[in-house]
Amino acid sequence: MIRHVFLWRVAPTADPAKVLAILSELPERVPGIRNFALGKFRDDLGTPPFAWDYGLSCEFDSIGDLATYFEHPQHQDIIARLEPMISDRAVCHFDAAGAANPE
């Protein structure tokens, strides 16, 4: 199982609700996504200077499925729609089965 994590900051002129609405379309538009989660940073413990505004995580059965997701036309459409609304981003994907014992 491959876990994909996407973190981002919303551009000052963008509507955060619109960004979330667009990203929430992913599971319906792109096949192969598992355990999709999307949300705003929780500042219950304060906000460190390195915090991101929002996060998305999902899983794929294989690295091949993740590659298919990256190249899928619907995923590419969502990226194009989000580009002007996101000021900064970070992406990480890793083997979720080995998450407890990273090498």
PLM feature spans:
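N-terminal soluble domains immediately following signal/targeting peptides that reside
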Residues: 73-75
